[in-house]
Amino acid sequence: MSDASRVLTLDEISHLTQEGGKPAETLMNVVALIAKRFQTDVCSAYLLEPDRTNLVLAATLGLRRECVGMLRLALNEGLAGMVAEQVRPVAVAEATKHPRFKFFPEAGEEKYHSFLGVPLIDRGVLQGVLVVQTTEPRTFGEQDIRMLTDAAAQVANVVSEARTLEKFIAPVQERLWALARNLWWSWDHDTVSIFRDLDPVRWAQLNHNPITLLSELPLADVERRAGELMLHGRINYAYRRQQEYLHSDRTWGATHAGVLRPRPVAYFSAEFGVHESLPIYSGGLGVLAGDHIKSASDLDIPLVAIGLFYREGYFKQRLDASGWQQEDYLLTDLSKLPMEPAIGADGLPVNIQIETRSGVIRAKVWRIKVGRIDLLLLDSDEITSRLYGGDGRVRIRQELLLGVGGVRALRAMGITPGVFHMNEGHSGFAVLEAIRERMYDEGLTFDQAVPYVKQEVVFTTHTPVPAGHDRFGADLIEEHLGPLRDALGISHERLMELGSEAGEGHQWQFCMTVLGLKLSRRANAVSSLHGVVSRAMWPGVPIGHITNGVHVPTWLAPQMYRLYDRHLGADWHLHSGESRIWEGIENIDDGELWETHLSLKSTLIQFVRRRAVDQAERRGESPESIQRLSRVLSPDALTIGFARRFATYKRANLILRDIEKLGSMVNDPKRPVQFVFAGKAHPRDEPGKGVLQEIAALMRDRQFAEKFVFVEDYDINVGRFLVQGVDVWLNNPRRPLEASGTSGQKVVLNGGLNLSVLDGWWAEAYDGLNGFAIGTGRTHSNMDVHDTRDSEALYRVLHDEVIPLYYQRDRDGLPRGWIKRMKRTIRTLGWRFNADRMVMDYTLKTYVPAAGGTSSEMRQAF
């Protein structure tokens, strides 16, 4: 570099440092300038942490930016550590051959060879290290060293300013709150780690709620923690990524869903399971809806979600001394949720009302940001106090509010949907309100308006048994829909026909699923087998299928995420619904994959032990019992997980049908097996509670005491630990009663293997080598015979296939056959059963055609 260039560069750096911007942003700009002027591929600034024994990456151009604030090295590690340790410049032409070279694969360092680092010193105090690197070997001369040293002197001043927290804390606080108010943080591992690091103990106690955490933490504590942990760079980087995410126009949706931009999809669901800190879900349906809108956000699908706000949510579960389920309902503090009033087109908070024969239902409307998606929640005090609580009268009022109220809320906000997607029949009344609006707006009769609205309706059914569909008597229908029926200009009989099956005669029951099927142009089941079952249940109705999937960033463990980053490419998550991305799984070293899995398994076991102890202490159990529970489960034993709703058809107790066989398995000294169970029974499901009690009793049986654990109060958090840490996921419903199931899909992403009846999604996923099957798919009309056959098949596959394969190790101690199956399950199923693929299917096969974007017709099976 010439003297003139040197002077110009120093002048430019001086200009940047004097602009008065935020220190972290200035530092980013300076390293970018240095890389350009030095013609290097990388320029990075590492700051000395307060303990003065570690460096942390604070700014970089060339390395992976997600490593800012995350990549740390001790002063005795690497070449950068050597610069700080010896407080002198270090120049190496071929860094990979130097004895102090340390490889950081997460930073993408494998491409860079030459290294020049100089200390950052301000007023005689070491602040950090400034580094440049190139992809080709290069010898840095005295002039290069002098030039970078001069630049470092100016950069050190910026670093000193960055450490002056008075100038830094206001934007940090502001950005922390901006991150907390959008649930995007819940599926961004780096942002989650920021909130956790602020106060790990309180974070866990608050059920991972950043709004509550920030409300409790005094400003001084935030300042102290941010300074101690060097969080500033991480916070700024997380905020910047959030803003880039929210405002990017280079998305899948921008290319494929443009027709939905002026008139978005209105997605209705009775529950949404987005995160454990927002407890308005009970189980699979809600978690699926949460995953649906997260992937819609990631893909940038124009969509607005509509649900209900349950102030007491679903119940908190605890078991009494006999193992019987008890339910507690807790009132949610609205101020501790990322909610704000929805604002209407008139600039005022939205309030809606619905007339019934027995009075007016009034509701407020809240808005929650879920990435790019608005989630609107209608709140009507007692009507929406509890999810799935109350009698038929409460239920119909909730569904009236969800459907009719949801459409009116959209209208009040100036939103005109181009597509109405009903996730199950609970929101079916929305179509009637949409018809009324079309009649009013365009001067049409009911019969004229129906075809127009029907074309825009997508209906998803999740229930494979007739008894599972909501039905209401004629009196309840007339009481609650009478005024709407009057506005539609139809008779009571005509309205009842819309929800009645043929041949029901005068004993009319209004079925919400029938309403959804009759008033939708496109209807789908949620797996291939469920499509077959649904078409048999509703003969003559063209029901296709779109198989459910799960949101990858939500359910994938951070350790596995980093593993995929290294082997699938840094942007693999942007294309997780494409099969080609997952081929790289085969390139992962067996040992690396296995060690990652064992780490997650250890984390699960520690979590289960803590919960088991907490449960025992709450019940007042003896110190001896508590001590025993602190040691439950072995990290070396084959660990099988089962977690889901405790409905009797899911047969949580199938494994108990032959206690002698089960006992021999769990107590085998050479090849032991252990089980972790979790799940809730519906408060009115006494048989389901009985099954749960059977499972819980094994924790007190000496033969099974340390091999069977029931984790109380199953929620998204418990589910996350289980699906990320188990070796095997057990699923044994009575075929064909499982519409899809998604918990096993979450296990796939983390390398666990499914052991399942060929029902729901597993019927189309299993290929003989990517997991294990219970039976061959045969059923029997006699329930006891059916269960006996399946239990025998379960014991057989455990004894003959699962257990031997897990414990078969090579000379390195690795279960190569098991790992081969792990890789196959990830490679063959990771792309097929994730929510990105699912939402892309809905968009191309239902949303775009429903909005008039294509002329394609829905086939029976799509």
What are these regions (language model features)?
Residues 14-21, 30-39, 45-49, 65, ...:
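Short regulatory alpha-helical segment in sensory/regulatory domains of signaling proteins that mediates
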Residues 120-130:
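Short hydrophobic/glycine-rich mini-motifs in sensory/regulatory modules
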